Amino acid sequence: MKALTTRQKEVFDLIRDHITQTGMPPTRAEIASRLGFRSPNAAEEHLKALARKGAIEIVSGASRGIRLMIEEESGLPLIGRVAAGEPLLATQHIESHYQVDPALFKPHADFLLRVSGMSMKDIGIMDGDLLAVHKTQDACNGQVVVARIDDDVTVKRLKRQGNIVELLPENSEFDPIVVDLRQQELTIEGLAVGVIRNGNWL
C-alpha cells in the first residue's frame, strides 16, 4: 500500500474505528460530519484516493460500501493511554495485539487493558496485569467495570443509587470515587471478565 497523507490516514482511521464500534463502515455523510468536510462529495474524493492507494475497496451502489483492504491484526487489542474525548478502541490507543481467544472469557472479551496501581488487589487484580474487558455500557451494581470519568479511565466495583455513583476499590488503602451524575460525566466502557497475570512476581 502506498503511504497515506495525514488527512487520508484520518479518514482511514475513522472507517476502521467505526467498523470496530458498530460492525459496519460509516456513510459518506457520517465521514463528512465527523471530519468537518463541507459535503459528502468531499468525503467521496478522499475515499477514491484511499482506493487508488490500495487501502480500501469501494463497493458501488451502497451508502456504506467500503471495505478495508489492509489485513487487520488478529487477537485482542491491548489499550494503552487514552486521549480525552476519544473512543477507547480508537486505533491510536491500541499498543499491540495478544493471541488470546476471546471465548475463554464469559461474556467474551473485546479488548485488554493494562492495570495501573493496586486499588483492586484484594480481588487479585494487580499492577501490570492485563484485564480482559467485555465492551458494554450495561452494568449492574456489584460488577467490576472499566469506567471513564471525564478524562480518566479507572477499574472499580460499581455501586449506583439514583444520580450518585460510587466506584469502589478492593483495597482498604484507597478511597471510593464518588460521582454525581448531575455535575460530572461518567461512561461505562465495559465489564471486567478476566485477568492475565503479570509475571513479575514469579
UniProtKB/Swiss-Prot annotation:
<comment type="subunit">
    <text>Homodimer.</text>
</comment>
<keyword id="KW-0235">DNA replication</keyword>
<keyword id="KW-0378">Hydrolase</keyword>
<dbReference type="GO" id="GO:0004252">
    <property type="term" value="F:serine-type endopeptidase activity"/>
</dbReference>
<feature type="DNA-binding region" description="H-T-H motif">
    <location>
        <begin position="28"/>
        <end position="48"/>
    </location>
</feature>
<keyword id="KW-0742">SOS response</keyword>
<dbReference type="InterPro" id="IPR006199">
    <property type="entry name" value="LexA_DNA-bd_dom"/>
</dbReference>
<keyword id="KW-0068">Autocatalytic cleavage</keyword>
<dbReference type="Pfam" id="PF00717">
    <property type="entry name" value="Peptidase_S24"/>
</dbReference>
<dbReference type="GO" id="GO:0006260">
    <property type="term" value="P:DNA replication"/>
</dbReference>
<dbReference type="GO" id="GO:0006281">
    <property type="term" value="P:DNA repair"/>
</dbReference>
<dbReference type="InterPro" id="IPR039418">
    <property type="entry name" value="LexA-like"/>
</dbReference>
<keyword id="KW-0805">Transcription regulation</keyword>
<feature type="site" description="Cleavage; by autolysis">
    <location>
        <begin position="84"/>
        <end position="85"/>
    </location>
</feature>
<dbReference type="GO" id="GO:0045892">
    <property type="term" value="P:negative regulation of DNA-templated transcription"/>
</dbReference>
<dbReference type="InterPro" id="IPR036390">
    <property type="entry name" value="WH_DNA-bd_sf"/>
</dbReference>
<dbReference type="InterPro" id="IPR006200">
    <property type="entry name" value="LexA"/>
</dbReference>
<dbReference type="InterPro" id="IPR036388">
    <property type="entry name" value="WH-like_DNA-bd_sf"/>
</dbReference>
<comment type="similarity">
    <text>Belongs to the peptidase S24 family.</text>
</comment>
<dbReference type="GO" id="GO:0003677">
    <property type="term" value="F:DNA binding"/>
</dbReference>
<keyword id="KW-0678">Repressor</keyword>
<dbReference type="InterPro" id="IPR050077">
    <property type="entry name" value="LexA_repressor"/>
</dbReference>
<dbReference type="InterPro" id="IPR015927">
    <property type="entry name" value="Peptidase_S24_S26A/B/C"/>
</dbReference>
<dbReference type="GO" id="GO:0009432">
    <property type="term" value="P:SOS response"/>
</dbReference>
<keyword id="KW-0227">DNA damage</keyword>
<comment type="function">
    <text>Represses a number of genes involved in the response to DNA damage (SOS response), including recA and lexA. Binds to the 16 bp palindromic sequence 5'-CTGTATATATATACAG-3'. In the presence of single-stranded DNA, RecA interacts with LexA causing an autocatalytic cleavage which disrupts the DNA-binding part of LexA, leading to derepression of the SOS regulon and eventually DNA repair.</text>
</comment>
<dbReference type="GO" id="GO:0006508">
    <property type="term" value="P:proteolysis"/>
</dbReference>
<feature type="active site" description="For autocatalytic cleavage activity">
    <location>
        <position position="119"/>
    </location>
</feature>
<dbReference type="InterPro" id="IPR006197">
    <property type="entry name" value="Peptidase_S24_LexA"/>
</dbReference>
<keyword id="KW-0238">DNA-binding</keyword>
<keyword id="KW-0804">Transcription</keyword>
<dbReference type="Pfam" id="PF01726">
    <property type="entry name" value="LexA_DNA_bind"/>
</dbReference>
<protein>
    <recommendedName>
        <fullName>LexA repressor</fullName>
        <ecNumber>3.4.21.88</ecNumber>
    </recommendedName>
</protein>
<dbReference type="InterPro" id="IPR036286">
    <property type="entry name" value="LexA/Signal_pep-like_sf"/>
</dbReference>
<keyword id="KW-0234">DNA repair</keyword>
<feature type="active site" description="For autocatalytic cleavage activity">
    <location>
        <position position="156"/>
    </location>
</feature>
